[in-house]
Curated annotation (Swiss-Prot):
Location(s), subcellular: Cell inner membrane
Protein role: Responsible for the transport of dicarboxylates such as succinate, fumarate, and malate from the periplasm across the membrane.
Biological process (GO), any one: L-aspartate transmembrane transport
Protein name: C4-dicarboxylate transport protein
GO cellular component, as recorded: plasma membrane
A Pfam family the protein falls into: SDF
Primary subcellular site in the record, as a coarse category: membrane
Organism: Sinorhizobium medicae (strain WSM419)
Family (UniProt): Belongs to the dicarboxylate/amino acid:cation symporter (DAACS) (TC 2.A.23) family.
Bilayer topology term: Multi-pass membrane protein
């Protein structure tokens, strides 16, 4: 049984669908086509007019800010109303526990995959770079931020100083913490809290409508972000370290379609169908290099695909800090690349230490551009064998690997949501099959707008 707001959204979609039957929506009106065209235009502008391209960074930054502005209320409404509707509060603990088991298992597997591939391919072998010749100042800022991170600090940061502080700062884990506690409180109060729950459910529709409006700016944000990236770093900068970039992209591709593909098949769905289903969100992540930009859309689509709201609200926001498959592959692969490029021998003991440290430091990496680089600095600062100054080697190309990290993280969280929902018995398999098979008229968030802009 869908909540009232979801029924209203479905009514709107039915109206739109009937309009499409009378006259099919032109291809250029689809969001994924617009974003794809914007990415291509940004690449061309950044390449041929780099000075102009570097000045367009505010377009990408502004769009990310717009999306981050709405993430906190989306998470709060989804989680609080989802938990409030639970008759068995023990389910909250079970869902969270199963999600953390999944996150730990696949995060560790991703780290191992990066480690194994780096040993087999050895992308940094033969470079013979002296660490003393590298510009350590270039990575000093990242290293300083890395030193500020600690496990205790990370855990304490989950608890906000004030109730409104979490929403003001937009910290995902803090908002999730408050949302879970508030949802549990509503469930405990019971009937007396029904007016509050009804209000929150009614508020969900205009909030998602606001997301729809903001998503109309996605092509502009993707255009600005891509023009800046190419304009500042240049396509030529990729060629110097093409081996590392190619190895990382191929490894991530295989992890998604082989490892996660096997998990998907075991749980009764196709990874290819899932990727097609979330293609608009993936293009948005590609254009902005931030998985946070597509978080509201992913939560919306996972619920439409048959995952219960309570599972979606717990798994996805938590996964943005604890289930970062792409970041984990990158960390061990990049660390061994630096060691190989600087002729730093690493014993099996050193590599195991690197793996253990990475398992801890990768938790809590934010879903924003550059977070993976800071996390790598945190890992290398604890492992003395690998020179931190070696990070200067990959500083120029990190931005080009950031997209792949974000895409892999994003798909990993989509798979995790479906798997945990199935484990908990909170997945409508028929609805999932219909959504992934294209049999349902499941639209992206922007399609909620009834009257398309002329």
């Amino acid at each position: 049984m869908l909540p009232d707001w979801a029924c209203h959204v479905e009514d709107i979609m039915i109206i739109e669908h009937s309009a499409e039957v009378r006259g099919k929506t032109p291809l250029y009106r689809h969001l994924y086509v617009q974003v794809l065209a914007a990415i291509a235009a940004g690449i061309l502008l950044g390449h041929f007019y780099p000075d102009i391209g570097t000045q367009l960074k505010p377009l990408g930054d502004a769009f990310i800010r717009l999306v981050k502005m709405i993430i906190a209320p989306v998470i709060f409404l989804t989680v609080a109303t989802g938990i409030a509707g639970m008759t068995d509060l023990a389910k909250v603990g079970r869902v969270a526990g199963k999600a953390m088991i999944y996150f730990l298992a696949f995060s560790t597997l991703a780290l191992l995959v990066g480690l194994v591939v780096a040993n087999l391919v050895q992308p940094g072998a033969g470079m013979h770079i002296d660490p003393a010749s590298l510009d350590a100042k270039a990575v000093a800022t990242y290293a300083q931020k890395a030193h500020e991170q600690s496990i205790t600090g990370f855990l304490m940061n989950i608890i906000p100083t004030t109730l409104v502080g979490a929403f003001a700062e937009g910290d995902i884990l803090q908002v999730l913490f408050i949302s879970v506690l508030f949802g549990i409180s509503l469930a405990i109060v019971g009937k007396k809290a029904e007016p509050v729950v009804d209000f929150l459910q009614a508020l969900t529709l205009p909030i998602f409508r606001l997301v729809a409006i903001l998503m109309k700016a996605a092509p502009i944000g993707a255009f600005g972000a891509m023009a800046f990236t190419i304009g500042k770093y240049g396509i030529a900068s990729i060629a110097n370290l093409a081996m590392l970039i190619g190895t990382f992209y191929l490894t991530s591709f295989l992890f998604v379609f082989v490892v996660l593909g096997a998990v998907a098949r075991y749980n009764g769905f196709s990874i290819l169908s899932l990727v097609r289903y979330i293609k608009e969100e993936l293009l948005l992540v590609l254009g902005t290099s931030s998985s946070e930009a597509a978080l509201p859309g992913l939560m919306n689509k996972m619920e439409k695909a048959g995952c219960k709201r309570s599972v979606v609200g717990l798994v996805i926001p938590t996964g943005y800090s604890f289930n970062l498959d792409g970041t984990n592959i990158y960390m061990t692969l990049a660390a061994l690349f630096i060691a190989q490029a600087t002729d730093t021998p690493l014993s099996y003991g050193d590599q195991i230490l690197l793996l253990l440290v990475a398992m801890l430091s990768s938790k809590g990496a934010a879903g924003i551009t550059g977070a993976g680089f800071i996390t790598l600095a945190a890992t290398l600062s604890v492992v003395p064998s690998v020179p931190v100054a070696g990070m200067a080697l990959i500083l120029g190309i990190d931005r080009f690997m950031s997209e792949c990290r974000a895409l892999t993280n994003f798909v990993g969280n989509a798979v995790a949501t479906i798997v945990v929902a199935k484990w908990e018995g909170e997945l409508d398999q028929a609805q999932l099959s219909a959504a992934l098979g294209g049999e349902m008229q499941v639209e992206t968030i922007p399609a909620v707008v009834v009257q398309p802009a002329e």
